């Protein structure tokens, strides 16, 4: 656009200036005339009450859809099994519960947003206003203006007159948080005493984790390290990982004279001792053993336990000794547990004390 195309009243005013001086507009803060706001054009909802009613019903329908989607979210959470899968093209086989929760919660939130946008675009006041910049300091006049603007906004939103919109909006906003409340159920149930007990009980055979065969005393050589689990626990079992995380054992054979802890000696069989394989720091499986020092080392954070002295902690961040399992030999000559651990295995937790 050339200067000939600009209306004369919008051009900067001419001003006398010495030769070579920089050109400066007549008004540095506003070099062009303010064209002002265009005239307001009423919408169809502003002049036709029937159109306004249709918009009101549309907004209410969206808010109602949000409420129904929230109810569907809760129903899906309760009714759909966590292991159920469903084929969705092109996603393939996915969790039916996750798909249902995601879709219903997405619809619930989208419907609230869409309803609010449609309400603002069709029923709220759409007149443009200009507000001059003002100091940041909130003077009494400014605070009074804020209150007045709030009242004016409430009036222009027609929320007092459009009770159907108000009620359905409040209903949708009230129900949506229930989705998060329902999800709190996944924080429970409380573990109760599950962390205090394992699969070990009196008479349970010690099974070699590598060969899946019951252990005899002759299978454990002096200075060797053997990993064991309770009989009857199979890798394909649904709860295998949860159970082995508590019941895994380290079987070590020491010279009885080298055992320093009296209880450790009493709970052993001919120098064979059984300790929990789970580190008491953060639950890593212990797998390193020093034959000469009888020290077991956790590879995660280097917690070190003296297996000849009650598996006490001699180095590292672990908080307490490894629990020992009392063992013996049954009539058939196999190593067996004489009960469960006397204390919870693994890391400490609040209820452990």
From Swiss-Prot:
GO cellular component, one term: plasma membrane
Main location: membrane
Any GO MF annotation of the entry: 2 iron, 2 sulfur cluster binding
PROSITE patterns (UniProt xref): RIESKE
Subunit structure: The cytochrome bc1 complex is composed of a cytochrome b (QcrB), the Rieske iron-sulfur protein (QcrA) and a diheme cytochrome c (QcrC) subunit.
CC cofactor note: Binds 1 [2Fe-2S] cluster per subunit.
Organism in which the protein naturally occurs: Streptomyces coelicolor (strain ATCC BAA-471 / A3(2) / M145)
Family: Belongs to the Rieske iron-sulfur protein family.
Designated gene of the protein: qcrA
Function according to Swiss-Prot or TrEMBL: Iron-sulfur subunit of the cytochrome bc1 complex, an essential component of the respiratory electron transport chain required for ATP synthesis. The bc1 complex catalyzes the oxidation of menaquinol and the reduction of cytochrome c in the respiratory chain. The bc1 complex operates through a Q-cycle mechanism that couples electron transfer to generation of the proton gradient that drives ATP synthesis.
Keywords of the record: 2Fe-2S, Cell membrane, Disulfide bond, Electron transport, Iron, Iron-sulfur, Membrane, Metal-binding, Oxidoreductase, Respiratory chain, Transmembrane, Transmembrane helix, Transport
Ranges that cross the membrane: 60-80, 99-119, 164-184
Cofactor: [2Fe-2S] cluster
Claim: GTP-binding is one of the keywords in the record: no
The protein's name in its UniProt record: Cytochrome bc1 complex Rieske iron-sulfur subunit
Region (Disordered) location: 1-51
Bridged cysteine pairs (disulfide): 284-300
Basic and acidic residues bias locations: 40-51
CDD domains, alphabetized: Rieske
Residues binding [2Fe-2S] cluster: 279, 281, 298, 301
Domain Rieske per the UniProt entry, residue ranges: 246-336
InterPro entries: QcrA_N, Rieske_2Fe-2S, Rieske_2Fe-2S_sf, Rieske_Fe-S_prot
Location of this chain's protein in the cell: Cell membrane
Membrane topology classification: Multi-pass membrane protein
């Amino acid at each position: 656009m050339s200067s000939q195309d600009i209306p004369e009243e919008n051009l900067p005013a001419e001003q006398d200036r010495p030769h070579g001086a920089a050109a400066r507009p007549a008004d540095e803060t506003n070099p062009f005339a303010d064209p002002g706001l265009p005239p307001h054009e009423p919408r169809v909802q502003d002049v036709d009450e029937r159109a306004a009613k249709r918009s009101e019903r549309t907004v209410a329908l969206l808010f109602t859809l949000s409420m129904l989607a929230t109810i569907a979210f809760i129903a899906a959470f309760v009714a759909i099994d966590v292991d159920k899968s469903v084929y969705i093209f092109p996603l393939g086989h996915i969790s039916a519960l996750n798909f249902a929760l995601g879709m219903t919660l997405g619809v619930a939130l989208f419907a609230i947003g869409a309803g609010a946008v449609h309400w603002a675009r069709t029923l709220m006041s759409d007149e443009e206003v200009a507000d001059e910049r003002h100091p940041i300091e909130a003077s009494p006049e400014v605070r009074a203006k804020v209150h007045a603007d709030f009242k004016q906004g409430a009036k222009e939103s027609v929320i007092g007159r459009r009770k159907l919109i108000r009620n359905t909006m409040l209903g949708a906003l009230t129900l949506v948080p229930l989705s998060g409340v329902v999800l709190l159920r996944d924080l429970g149930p409380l573990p109760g005493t599950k962390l205090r007990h394992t699969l070990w009980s009196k008479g349970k055979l010690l099974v070699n984790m590598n060969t899946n065969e019951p252990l005899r005393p002759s299978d454990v050589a002096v200075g060797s390290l053997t990993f064991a689990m309770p009989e009857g626990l199979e890798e394909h079992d649904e709860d295998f990982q949860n159970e082995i995380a508590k019941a895994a054992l380290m079987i070590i054979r020491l010279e009885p004279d080298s055992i320093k802890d009296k209880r450790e000696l009493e709970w052993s069989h001919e120098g064979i001792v059984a300790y929990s394989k789970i580190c008491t720091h953060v639950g890593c499986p212990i797998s390193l053993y020093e034959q000469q020092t009888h020290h077991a080392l956790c590879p995660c954070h280097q917690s070190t336990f003296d297996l000849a002295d009650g598996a006490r902690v001699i180095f590292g961040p672990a908080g307490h000794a490894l629990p020992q399992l009392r063992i013996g030999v049954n009539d058939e000559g196999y190593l067996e547990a004489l009960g469960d651990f006397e204390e919870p295995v693994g890391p400490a937790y609040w209820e452990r004390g």
